[in-house]
Amino acid sequence: MTQHMIEIKSPYFLREESLASPADFAAVFGNRNPLVLEIGCGIGDFVTQLASSAPERNYLAIDIYNKGCNKTCNRLEQARLTNVRVMRIEARYLLEQFLATESLAAVYINCPDPWPKKRHLKRRLVNERFLQTLLHYLQPGGELFFSSDVADYAHAVTAHLNQIKGYENRLPVPVALDMAGYPLSKYMRRFLAQGQSIHFIHHRRNPQHTCETAAPQPVHRGFRTAWSANNG
């Protein structure tokens, strides 16, 4: 089914054609505050809470769904925040095309599609290849936050992180069932109200780590990039 396209006219919305490669986000925000990325912003509940609590940081919220981007922009306008921008773009394409290496202070990925069927596991966004790529774009000491309502996905991500030199766990356990002070999206709150669990991961790029692997392979534009068994 083709999603009805909403023309987004909000000043919070960034269009690809308005950006250089890599983009100058200091110019976009009008300052050089640390840049934080949220992958999969949904309707914008999480990033609105996060940006409100840390106005000294800039936030780029992305999603592949036009409707979600529009709702996020509307929510930001209501909150009158100035430190958030929204893009409709696929995460891997954003990293390769518009972000400079070591440009991100933090990345948040909350409850991405778990693709629970065994034959679809290779479609998960957060796999070993993606985490290796992400390491290039995190600043030394840059943080990675991941959450999932599917325990198997969270533990798979932990296993991938343990295989990659350069990440270090910031929690006393590999996967936590609670994280003090962590904003909860509407989806998370609804899930918890049903008596289910959210599984949290918090790693960072080791400040002493130098990325010695080859630069990430180019990613072609699109909201459904090619999947392969080699993606992890």
Swiss-Prot record:
What residues bind S-adenosyl-L-methionine, as annotated? E38, D63, E90, D113
Which UniProt keywords are present, listed alphabetically? Answer: Methyltransferase, S-adenosyl-L-methionine, Transferase, tRNA processing
List the SUPFAM superfamilies: S-adenosyl-L-methionine-dependent methyltransferases (SSF53335)
Question: Which Gene3D superfamilies would you find in this protein's record?
Answer: Vaccinia Virus protein VP39
A single Gene Ontology MF term assigned here is: tRNA (guanine(46)-N7)-methyltransferase activity
In terms of CDD domains, this protein maps to: AdoMet_MTases (cd02440)
- GO cellular component terms, A-Z: tRNA methyltransferase complex
What the entry lists under InterPro entries is as follows:
SAM-dependent_MTases_sf, tRNA_(Gua-N-7)_MeTrfase_Trmb, tRNA_methyltr_TrmB_bact
Q: What does this protein do?
A: Catalyzes the formation of N(7)-methylguanine at position 46 (m7G46) in tRNA.
Membership in a protein family:
Belongs to the class I-like SAM-binding methyltransferase superfamily. TrmB family.
This chain belongs to the protein called: tRNA (guanine-N(7)-)-methyltransferase
Q: Can you name the source organism?
A: Syntrophotalea carbinolica (strain DSM 2380 / NBRC 103641 / GraBd1) (Pelobacter carbinolicus)
**Gene from which this protein is expressed:** trmB
